[in-house]
Regions:
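Carbohydrate-active catalytic/glycan-binding domains of CAZyme proteins
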Residues: 1-2, 20-556
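N-terminal export leaders
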Residues: 4-10
Length: 556
């Protein structure tokens, strides 16, 4: 009987095959970043950018004495981060408008599709958020009683294009957005701005659409990609501000005005009202690609603009994405001015004349460091992954982040077991402790730095040729990994993984029993830049795990 039982157990083991990979356990995640430009703001100054790293396409609104801001998030989840501030300098993230899988489905989307250019506004005790889910449903509106959420599921809006924005006038509302022109496009990038009334009580469009700008400031000059429009009214004029030139180094902000909401709109003779494209590219620590602005009036009557811009470390090279900046707006001769032509965007400027508050909020600008011990009930809201998960990707237990992954980075069919934080500085050191034993060929767990589905790196533990090893692998706008460096390791011992980033290069080191060894130094990581990888996002860095066979499901 005992022999029969033993034989049965051996047969079962043979059928089951080799032992499966256990989960990866990460602890003590640390980030320490500093700006390449060393600026010392004065006591009455603030620092640009106000939101460092991948926080593009800012939309701002004021409710009483409080300001709210939302950014694009593309195919990252949770998405559409929402911030609150009382002084427009110290910002605290209070939620993500997309924080439930049943709101949107990002399955099959590449990292730079999904959530484009949201706009936030407030009316009759309700917040409104309009945006575009590119390749996943089109234009939509969501509502919430509290900007922190919960936000509703999307109500889909039946018009094409991107970048919708709501303009409120009394009890009426209008949506302005980028669409195809009324005529056949004359050139690449020929777009138009349209306006249509929005019934905010039923969340539906009403009446006909009117094209109010065709092409841009001067269609004879073939202006490209007029987008990101916003309307406001001042002293009897309707003002339309919009981005022009595409969200690269030719980006700009332009303005038009009209006596009637449906036009005709006249462009300002002094356009653009914001751009850095005429400045010398080789200037020290440049700010480039400025545009996609939205204006807000303070309770004291002053005007300010939030907008996106970038901080390249080389010729149009930036890994951290497009960031949120702030500048005052001056009105002269009936037109708004954000920055005079030929002037550089300042890294430090006089702060808005508002009461300084919330100075204990987690820093979003300048040099800063943080540490996550994973000892809370959930990850903080600034951790993000790729695409909407069909099931939970992680669990937190005993001060550790636990990952079991069945979808690999680069596989668009699902959400990889990757959770990360935005890289917010070109000079940064990121580290974590890892405990992991790979059992199946190709199993891996470690740190990943992800710019796109075809451009990322992995630094961690894997199994190759039947043996565990530490490996640095890169994918450079490709569907295949390239091994950069490897070293044998003992998987029974916890590892300290450290990535030190410095612009377009990086150093990779690991620690065992308190001793650090450099695996690779001066590694070229320019492939993580937007210029090389393409798209609209910034690099996200964090724990990642993958196995073809998973021992247990994630439970929470």
């Amino acid at each position: 009987m005992r022999k029969t039982r033993r034989a049965a157990l051996l047969l079962l083991a043979a059928i089951a095959g080799p032992a499966l990979a256990g989960p990866a356990r990460f602890s003590d995640f640390r980030y320490d970043g500093r700006a390449q430009e060393q600026v010392t703001p004065g006591p009455d100054d603030y620092r640009n950018p106000i939101l460092s790293g991948y926080y593009p396409d800012p939309s701002i609104t004021r409710v009483g004495d409080t300001y709210y801001l939302v950014n694009s998030s593309f195919a990252h989840y949770p998405g559409l981060p929402v911030f609150r501030s009382s002084d427009m300098v110290h910002w605290r993230q209070i939620g993500n408008a997309i924080d439930r899988p049943d709101q949107f489905d990002f399955s099959g989307l590449r990292s730079s599709r999904g959530m484009f250019a949201p706009d936030i506004s407030f009316h009759d005790e309700l917040f409104y958020l309009v945006g575009t889910c590119v390749d996943c449903g089109g234009n939509f509106v969501m509502t919430a009683k509290d900007a922190a959420g919960p936000w509703s599921k999307p109500h889909w809006l039946p018009f094409e294009g991107i970048d919708p924005s709501i303009y409120w006038e009394g009890e009426r509302a209008f949506i302005v957005n980028n669409r195809a022109p009324a005529e056949p496009p004359r050139y690449e990038g020929h777009r138009a701005i349209w306006v249509q009334e929005f019934d905010w009580r039923t969340l539906t469009m009403t009446g006909g659409s009117t094209q109010i700008v065709n092409g841009g400031v001067d269609i004879r000059q073939k202006p490209a990609w007029i987008e990101g429009p916003h309307l406001l009214k001042r002293e009897g004029f309707y003002y339309l501000i919009a981005a022009e030139g595409g969200t690269g180094d030719q980006h700009s902000e332009v303005v038009f005005r009209a006596r009637d909401l449906r036009g005709p709109f006249t462009p300002y003779a002094g356009n653009p009202i914001l751009s850095q494209r005429s400045l010398a590219p080789a200037r020290p620590h440049p700010v480039t690609s400025a545009g996609h602005a939205k204006l807000v009036q303070t309770q004291a009557g002053d005007w300010w603009a939030t907008f996106l811009a970038t901080r390249p470390y080389g010729p149009d090279l930036y890994n951290i994405g497009r960031e949120t900046f702030l500048l005052p707006v001056a009105w002269r001769d009936g037109w708004p001015h954000i920055l005079e032509a030929g002037k550089t965007i300042p890294y430090a400027a006089k702060r808005p004349p508002l009461p300084v508050c919330d100075i204990d909020a987690p820093p979003t600008s300048g040099d800063f460091a943080y540490r996550d011990r994973f000892d809370g009930p959930r990850l903080s809201m600034d951790w993000i992954g790729l695409r909407t998960p069909k099931a939970p990707l992680y669990r937190l237990e005993a001060g550790a982040l636990v990952l079991d992954g069945t979808t690999a980075l680069g596989d668009l069919s699902g959400a990889p077991a990757f959770v990360g934080r935005r890289q917010q500085h070109h000079v940064a050191t990121i580290s974590t402790d890892l405990t992991y034993r790979p059992e199946t060929e190709g199993d891996r767990a470690g740190l990943a730095a992800v710019q796109s589905d075809r451009s990322f790196l992995f630094f961690g533990v894997t199994r190759k040729d039947g043996k565990p090893q530490l490996a640095l692998m890169v994918r450079e706008d490709s569907d295949h990994d390239r091994l950069v460096a490897a070293a044998p390791i003992d998987p029974a011992k916890p590892l300290r993984l450290t990535i030190a980033l410095d612009g377009g290069t990086a150093r990779f080191a690991y620690g065992v029993d308190g001793r650090e060894t450099v695996l690779a130094r001066d590694v070229d990581i320019r492939f993580l830049s937007t210029h090389e990888a393409g798209g609209f996002v910034g690099t996200v860095v964090g724990p990642y795990a993958w196995s073809a066979r998973v021992t247990r499901p994630i439970s929470n």
